[in-house]
Amino acid sequence: MVHDSTDDPDDTRVRKSRRGTALDAPPQETAPPDLDPATTGGDDEDDALLPDILEESGAVGEEPLASGHEAIERAVRLAPTSPGVYRMLNANADVLYVGKAKNVKKRLSNYARQSAPQPARILRMIAATVTVEIVSTNTETEALLLEANLIKQLRPRFNVQLRDDKSFPYILITGDHWAPQILKHRGAQTRPGRYFGPFASAGAVNRTITALQRAFLIRSCTDSFFESRSRPCLLYQIRRCAGPCTREIDFPGYTTLVREATDFLSGKSHAVKQELAGEMEKAANELEFETAALYRDRLAALSAIQSQQGINPRTVEEADVFAIHQEGGFSCVEVFFFRTGQNWGNRAYFPRAEKTFTPEEVLGSFLAQFYDDKPPPKNILLSHEIEESELLANALSIKAGHKIEVTAPKRGEKKELVAHALTNAREALGRKLADTATQGRLLDAMATTLSLPHAPKRIEVYDNSHIQGTNAVGAMIVAGPDGFVKNQYRKFNIKSEGLTPGDDYGMMREVLERRFKRLINPPEEGAKVKDDDFPQWPDLVIIDGGRGQLNAVREIFANLGLTQVSLMSVAKGPDRDAGRETLFMPEREAIKLEPRDPVLYFIQRLRDEAHRFVIGSHRKLRKKDIREAGLQEIPGIGPSRKRALLHHFGTLKEIERASIADLGKVPGVSAESARRIFEYFHPQPG
């Protein structure tokens, strides 16, 4: 979708049930991206997950079933005959199911009839129901939107759940500066400018922006960097920016470049390419071969964008295409995004649903949740007819302020797009099923090797990072039956003031106490939930270190009263060689595995992923401090050398990128000063 900036979208949120949340199972990190190979889809955001199947248990007992019917009958007596949303809750106040109805009393009466035949899934839900809560709405469309919002927030066990629900990135060409900037944008579209999207992934946006810079030479630097320039930056030298900061291009010329880029993203690619081709031919005829070569390179960059996009439909201007494939009790929904006649990528989703749900039921519930916080396009194309397509179209039309069509095309190019998406869904689910089976065997082997009571479903790995105690941060990663679950990674900025700089034990103590106290003492009803709140107990906790670190964590666990969580530490081998690690567990001898043991390789991957994540978190903190402090914090760098460095390189970012040799070329900067500057920007964190 292409549009100017808008007001903040409705940010209404519903409190999540503390007990009834079924959190996602993790993705396999090495799984092939669930993308059309011919598109610029989200290979770097492939966090699609396979959920646990909710297995059907045996026959439902007559007594709990009768009790559930009685609870629903009580609700029927008070239920309105108007539209609304109802929630079924169990004895722990967990939300089991969220539903909507045009006539709530009539819908609940269907559940209350004991003689009516019901699927086993519905009978289990009724048997667990203790109370029913009802919210009346003015219209059925309002009920549909509220139902989708509640399902996303409460994650009821018996509903279809959209789980990997990241916001989509857009390309923004700013409108609040005389020299507009091009950048990636997520979230509320409040900054003035033109927004182009959604794109399937950050990777798709980054590649497109890089190609657009080559084609249209639009700046990507921030306004503060722009204003501080005294000479063009490196991007100007490599022909990815026109250099408006130092007036290498005048205002009319830069405005023309911005207009061409906007036209290209708005679907006028053919006209833009024709214009550039005409300018190239004109320059060649006038023997301006260097200028002609510049136009040639710009045309090549535009062709590269279009070649990456794969399918670009002729008759579909704006649409999202949804195709669902089911196999082995799992569902995969593949989504393609088409805007301005261009393919802006695709993404695979693996919604959580009982295996008795039909493709139509899964897809219908998925769509309502998908567009709960996203602007819908004019056309939504489906692989299957859903029951309430007209109601969904009306609800989305009201929300968007323009007509939305929801159809399952039977012929023509739209049908071809759906068929292509269905092929991708089938292939993505096949890959994910294979990866899940492999991961399951690996976890079984891990349980056998480490003598765990069962194959771990949730593994948490902890690490911390700092430089002489500064910018100290701890981190936790999570893995399980499907690999790494990145949406449950957490970082912990170390807050304890009494810690000795570099006290790794103290940092780990703070991290673990903050993590597990949340599980031991859940927040009160209505309490604000913080980033490190998530109610799942791990089966195995892994830390980096030897027997000393293990004993320190055992003491922390003992003080917290934790006895049921398995604990292991991983000590690096001699010379930090991979494959020579030693594993330590409480009350056991040290464990040495063969270097080629798949379990050891898996443990190495877990440790390395935790290290990667914590180092990345540490570097973000350090870069923030560097931006705020500038060069003042570097020993021996006074005002005169600071001015010389900024005059030579232009910005702090360019100084950070410079090598020791480049730094040594600055007048007044000695070899020792160059080394100190380089080490300041490129430290080795602990």
Curated annotation (Swiss-Prot):
Keyword Disulfide bond part of the UniProt annotation: no
Listed GO CC annotations: cytoplasm; excinuclease repair complex
Stretches assigned to the GIY-YIG domain: 81-160
Keywords: Cytoplasm, DNA damage, DNA excision, DNA repair, Excision nuclease, SOS response
Compositionally biased spans, kind Basic and acidic residues: 1-14
Subcellular location(s) per record: Cytoplasm
Region annotation Disordered: where it falls in the sequence: 1-48
Record keyword Secreted present: no
An example Gene Ontology biological process: SOS response
Domain UVR: residue ranges: 270-305
Transmembrane segments: none
GO MF term (any one): excinuclease ABC activity
InterPro entries per record: GIY-YIG_endonuc, GIY-YIG_endonuc_sf, GIY-YIG_UvrC_Cho, Hlx-hairpin-Hlx_DNA-bd_motif, RuvA_2-like, UVR_dom, UVR_dom_sf, UvrABC_protein_C
Known role: The UvrABC repair system catalyzes the recognition and processing of DNA lesions. UvrC both incises the 5' and 3' sides of the lesion. The N-terminal half is responsible for the 3' incision and the C-terminal half is responsible for the 5' incision.
Assembly, per entry: Interacts with UvrB in an incision complex.
Family, similarity comment: Belongs to the UvrC family.
Protein name: UvrABC system protein C
